[in-house]
Amino acid sequence: MSIYHLDEFSRILYEKMTRLNPAIADMEPYEFRYALNNLVPQGGWASVKPDKKEDIEKRVNDRGFYNGIQIKPRQDDRIVLDENILRLAQMLFVGLVTGEYDEKWVQTHFFFDVRGFFFLHRTVYFTDIVLAHLGGKPFKSFEQKQKRLERCQDIGYKEFKEANAEVDGVLIESIQKLIAVRGTPILLAVAGPTAAGKTEIVARLRHVFEQAGQHVSSIEMDNFLTDRDYREEKGIFTLGKEALHFELFEQSLEDITHGKKISIPRYDFIFATSSHDLNGNLKPGGVPIEIEPADIIFIEGNFPFLLEEVIHLIGIKVVYLTDDPIRLKRKWKRDIDYRKKYEPTYFRNRFFKDQFIMAEIAYRPQMAVCDMIVDTTGAALWTTPEVAEILAKV
């Protein structure tokens, strides 16, 4: 029987995929075949001609490839998987079955999501620049308990939190020590990709500080956005300072770190308008947000220390990181099952498209200037040499 025959192709691929992703072993071969049938090309598997490995590597490490991904392509009035994502999966399947792609190479560059039944590129976060900034080795390492979640198709917060208990504990302890040395008032910013766990760790930090009798407040960066109509008219990207009432933002951070009460813009997320005009003045009828002085002030946002001009004002800069496969499983549970937030195929396209782009423009740059990185998947706390020296003395 030809390896391209549907039954034989599925049999060989199933065997190899169980080694690439242990969760495949929880599927019966016929269930695997059901899922695979959705990706069979019109001309059959023999019609797929795999590209050279070096060409694929170059493609998936080029931002232009991700810019070209469509998140809402339609066929017969329904959203379908982007053709580039589909073709990548088909080539990897065929390359595995024929032996043109060895399992180690596929595992190194890609991960397979069972629930979405597609391949995604593994995003590299710890670049040479980041590693040099952090002194080349973790400050502390623990058992990698997220490995216990490899066979899960989706992950809830309870099991995620349990897997991260040790590294979260040392993070909280380390931040408390840094605050004791650097003093208050202090700005604390936690950045990280979607579903990495940053919202939950911030809530836990806040609770710890309040239990210790410290006054805590927060500044939400999105409140400094200018009107969306203006940004769209000017083609302004929302990650840049041009999208913000930046002078107000900078002055607000300066003032609150000196114990002053601040009045900041209020952004209306329904109408996408700011309480302030482009000159930073309160509009007629606008209502600002008043923030009282505090010991610890969280900056809420995805890129709190991406803006070079305010980095020096942020007393503690943390990146909370979780690898893409775990984050994707968290989002299946949180955003699809619980929140019913996305149409599933739209979600697959969007997650595939966004991770490389966001790592390149937001997270790796922040990792290169932060004080600490929590790698929950690697179960390690990374710090700069300066911070490591402080923590060793306290």
Regions found by a protein language model. Give the residues of each.
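Post-Walker A alpha-helix
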Residues: 201-202, 206
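Long, basic/Gly/Ser/Thr-rich N-terminal segments
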Residues: 1-160
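P-loop (Walker A) phosphate-binding loop of NTP-binding proteins
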Residues: 193
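Conserved nucleotide-sensing/catalytic segment adjacent to the nucleotide-binding pocket
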Residues: 217-279
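Conserved lysine of the Walker
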Residues: 198
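ATP-dependent NMP and nucleoside kinases share a basic, alpha-helical "lid"
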Residues: 282-337
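Small-molecule kinase domains that catalyze NTP-dependent phosphoryl transfer to phosphate-bearing small molecules
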Residues: 75, 79-100, 104-109, 339-386
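N-terminal pre-Walker A segment at the start of P-loop NTPase domains
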Residues: 153-179
